[in-house]
Curated annotation (Swiss-Prot):
Subunit text: Heterooctamer of 4 alpha and 4 beta chains.
Role: ATP citrate-lyase is the primary enzyme responsible for the synthesis of cytosolic acetyl-CoA, used for the elongation of fatty acids and biosynthesis of isoprenoids, flavonoids and malonated derivatives. May supply substrate to the cytosolic acetyl-CoA carboxylase, which generates the malonyl-CoA used for the synthesis of a multitude of compounds, including very long chain fatty acids and flavonoids. In contrast to all known animal ACL enzymes having a homomeric structure, plant ACLs are composed of alpha and beta chains.
GO cellular component: cytosol
InterPro entries according to UniProt: Citrate-bd, Citrate_synth_N, Succinyl-CoA_synth-like
Gene Ontology terms: biological process: lipid metabolic process
Protein name: ATP-citrate synthase subunit alpha chain protein 1
Family statement: Belongs to the succinate/malate CoA ligase beta subunit family.
Annotated binding of citrate, by residue: N327, T329, R360
Pfam family, one: Citrate_synth_N
Length: 407
């Protein structure tokens, strides 16, 4: 399971749409998203409530504690919202040790309220943990002893009896409405493959539950069965403060288009030990698996090699190719893609004084290793080739010794 955070705007959109479908509960929530490209005149035309109601505006950037950080404005009209956004859009802020500009806001109706409730659902290995409190809001952590929690195993449904411990201390007249709401939210959680969902707080407006602040995470491995029919045009933003380089973005796009797994993250662009499977002065994390075809591996390897050979400084560098023993990835086929890329980058490899260490096992590995040995002699680039008899730690040690040796 890959837990991916989604924006509050999308969390509320999904909840509103599917809570009605699954539980017959029609949430009266409204929200609008504002970015650099937003035309406020057009936005108000599309959502007229923005010009008739008092509003709340806050960043929608996957970080919490917005209220405590002074990033939430309450009881504004649309002109004040526009000014608030203008003053902060693109401005860098620091949250949790990460710095990044604010690029996305959510605008909602201002809802005066007295009571704040807390609700969270977390997917666990054998089921789900559901937590509820009558003391929600920004002080929830200080009142965690008042949170009630149940665990619901995967095979058990959310029945009134299962929900009862969560709402046992509520006034009798509130238990039915809030209990039905919790059961409905849990149905949405399961049906849409949420892995985490939190409302802190939600309140009651005109007798109906109303989420004020919400966070959500989806299991993106469920995209094949839910993305089109249920998630709609969902966005999985990068974590706050994380920006993809052009090379990382290329591999990310390649990964999105294949059933295989292709990952690449630059950790230290000036490092001298580079990997083409799992990250090794280590400069990158890189991984390919799931039987990518030769063309996909070729494109992937080009990116890694361009990064690994950039800005030669006269010092030796090392490239680790391979990894563990493959289960079903055809080593011969994937190595063919890598070999094509190595041939293309021959001059860059030599300029960077690259030493290559290969270790691989699995289907057709003998063919792949034989091709690599032949390539070393043809290119005049040092390539040491090992099969499953060698260890990954062994070639890592060789790579470290190589780059640390005197030039």
């Amino acid at each position: 399971m890959a837990r991916k955070k989604i924006r509050e705007y999308d969390s509320k959109r999904l909840l509103k749409e599917h809570l009605k479908r699954l539980a017959g509960i029609d949430l009266q929530i409204l929200s609008a998203q504002v970015t650099q490209s937003t035309d406020f005149t057009e936005l108000v035309n599309q959502q007229p409530w923005l010009s008739t109601m008092k509003l709340v505006v806050k960043p929608d950037m996957l970080f919490g504690k917005r209220g405590k950080s002074g990033l939430v404005a309450l009881n504004l009209d649309i002109a004040q919202v526009k000014e608030f956004v203008k003053e902060r859009l693109g401005v860098e802020v620091e949250m949790g040790g990460c710095k990044a500009p604010i690029t996305t806001f959510i605008v909602e109706p201002f809802v005066p309220h007295d009571q704040e409730y807390y609700l969270s659902i977390v997917s666990e290995r054998l089921g789900s943990t559901i937590s509820f409190s009558e003391c929600g809001g920004i002080e929830i952590e200080e009142n965690w002893d008042k949170v009630k929690t149940i665990f619901l195993s995967t095979e058990k449904p959310m029945t009134p009896d299962a929900c009862a411990p969560l709402i046992a201390t509520l006034p009798l007249e509130a238990r039915g409405k809030i209990g039905d709401f919790i059961k409905g939210v849990f149905a949405v959680f399961q049906d849409l493959d949420f892995s985490f969902l939190e409302m802190n707080p939600f309140t009651i407006v005109n007798g109906e539950p109303y989420p004020l602040d919400m966070r959500g995470e989806l299991d993106d491995t469920a995209a094949f069965k839910t993305s089109r029919s249920k998630w709609g045009n969902i966005e999985f933003p990068l974590p706050f403060g994380r920006v993809l380089s052009s090379t990382e973005g290329f591999i990310h796009d390649l990964d999105e288009k294949t059933s295989a797994s292709l990952k690449f993250t630059v950790l230290n662009p000036k490092g001298r030990i580079w990997t083409m499977v799992a990250g090794g002065e280590l400069e990158n994390y890189a991984e390919y698996s799931g039987a990518p075809n030769e063309e996909e591996v070729l494109q992937y390897a080009r990116v890694v090699l361009d990064c690994a050979t950039a800005d030669p400084d006269g010092r030796k560098r090392a490239l680790l190719i391979g990894g563990g023993i493959a289960n079903f990835t055809d080593v011969g086929a994937t190595f063919s893609g890598i070999i094509r890329a190595l041939r293309e980058k021959e001059s860059k490899l030599k300029a960077a004084r690259m030493h290559i260490y290969v270790r691989r096992g699995g289907p057709n590995y003998q063919t792949g290793l034989a091709k690599m040995r032949k390539l070393g002699a043809e290119l005049g680039v040092p390539i040491e080739v090992y099969g499953p008899e060698a260890t990954m730690t062994g070639i890592c040690k060789q790579a470290i010794e190589c780059v640390m040796a005197a030039a």
